[in-house]
Curated annotation (Swiss-Prot):
GO terms for MF: oxidoreductase activity
Keyword match Oxidoreductase: yes
Enzyme class, spelled out: oxidoreductase
A Pfam family: adh_short_C2
InterPro entries: NAD(P)-bd_dom_sf, Sc_DH/Rdtase_CS, SDR_fam
Family from the record: Belongs to the short-chain dehydrogenases/reductases (SDR) family.
Name of the molecule in the record: Hydroxynaphthalene reductase-like protein Arp2
Domain of life: Eukaryota
C-alpha cells in the first residue's frame, strides 16, 4: 500500500463531502481523497468519536477535514449538511454518497418498517444527496453514488429488499448524469462486492456456498477469495482508490456509469 508521501496530491484545492465516512468504506474513501490533497467533510450520524478519529487521520496526511453530524434520511438535515460544509470550506467539488444498510429477509416476512428503513437510507437518502450535490457543486464537479453487486446478482435468497434499493440508485446515476451535464458534473456509481467492514462481518456468510451463521471469519474470507482471480477480498482502501480516480479531472469521460468493484470475482 502506498504511503501518503508516495501518493500524488492530484486533488489539491478540491473539497469533498463523504457521507457515512466515520467507518468502513466511507472512511476508506475519505482518507484516500485526503491523501491526494482534497479537504474532506466527514459526515456521520451517531458515531462521533470514530468520525473525529477519521478527521485526525486525515490531518496526518496534510489535508484538512471537519466532521459534521447529519441524519441523511431527513432532507432538512441534508440541506444543513451542505450549508455547513459550504460555510466551512467555501465550495464543494466532490460528493460521495456512501449510505447503506443490508438486510436478508424472506419476502413474505418483510414489513413496512423494514421497507422504509432500507429504502430511506439506501435509496431516498442517496437521491437527495445527489440532488443537493447537483445544486451546490462547482462546475466540473464529481458525484459518486453507492450501488452494490447485489443490484444485478441472481441466486441470492431473501435479498430482494436490499437488491432493489441499490438497483434504483443505478437508475438515478444515469439520469443525473444527463441532467448535470450542462455544469460539466459527472455522475457515476460504484458497485462493490464484499469489502472487509463491519457490514461484511455481519452478512458475508450469506454469499458463501453452504454458509451459515457463526461461520468463522477465516472460512468466509477463504470462501469468497476463491471466487476472485486476485485471491483475496476487498478492503476499504481498494474502494477509496477507485473513487479517487473518479474524482480526478482526468476521469471526465467516465460518466453515467456503474462500475463493478469485485477484483474480477465470478460467482
Amino acid at each position: 500500500m502506498a504511503s501518503s508521501e508516495e501518493t500524488p496530491r492530484s486533488l489539491a484545492g478540491k473539497v469533498a463531502l463523504v457521507t457515512g465516512a466515520g467507518r468502513g468504506i466511507g472512511k476508506g474513501i475519505a482518507v484516500e481523497l485526503a491523501k491526494r490533497g482534497a479537504s474532506v467533510v466527514v459526515n456521520y450520524n451517531s458515531a462521533e468519536k470514530p468520525a473525529q478519529e477519521v478527521v485526525d487521520e486525515i490531518a496526518k496526511t496534510g489535508s484538512r477535514a471537519v466532521a459534521i453530524k447529519a441524519d441523511i434520511t431527513k432532507v432538512p438535515e441534508v440541506s444543513r449538511l451542505f450549508q455547513e460544509a459550504l460555510q466551512h470550506f467555501g465550495h464543494l467539488d466532490i460528493v460521495v454518497s456512501n449510505s447503506g444498510t443490508e438486510v436478508f429477509k424472506p419476502e413474505d416476512e418483510v414489513t413496512e418498517e423494514d421497507y422504509d428503513r432500507v429504502f430511506n437510507l439506501n435509496t431516498r437518502a442517496q437521491f437527495f444527496i445527489a440532488q443537493h450535490a447537483y445544486v451546490h457543486l462547482r462546475n466540473g464537479g464529481r458525484i459518486v453514488l453507492m450501488s452494490s453487486v447485489a443490484a444485478n446478482m441472481s441466486g441470492i435468497p431473501n435479498h430482494a429488499l436490499y437488491a432493489g434499493s441499490k438497483a434504483a440508485v443505478e437508475g438515478f446515476t444515469r439520469s443525473f448524469a444527463v441532467d448535470a451535464g450542462h455544469k460539466k458534473i459527472t455522475v457515476n456509481a460504484i458497485a462493490p462486492g464484499g469489502v472487509k467492514t463491519d457490514m461484511y462481518d455481519a452478512n458475508a456468510w450469506h454469499y458463501v456456498p453452504n454458509g451459515k451463521p457463526g461461520m468463522p471469519m477465516e472460512e468466509i474470507d477463504k470462501g469468497l477469495a476463491a471466487f476472485c482471480p486476485l485471491g483475496r477480498v476487498a478492503v476499504p482502501q481498494d474502494i477509496g482508490r477507485v473513487v479517487a480516480f473518479l474524482a480526478h479531472p482526468d476521469s471526465e469521460w467516465v460518466n453515467g456509469q456503474v462500475i463493478l468493484l469485485t477484483g474480477g470475482s465470478v460467482t
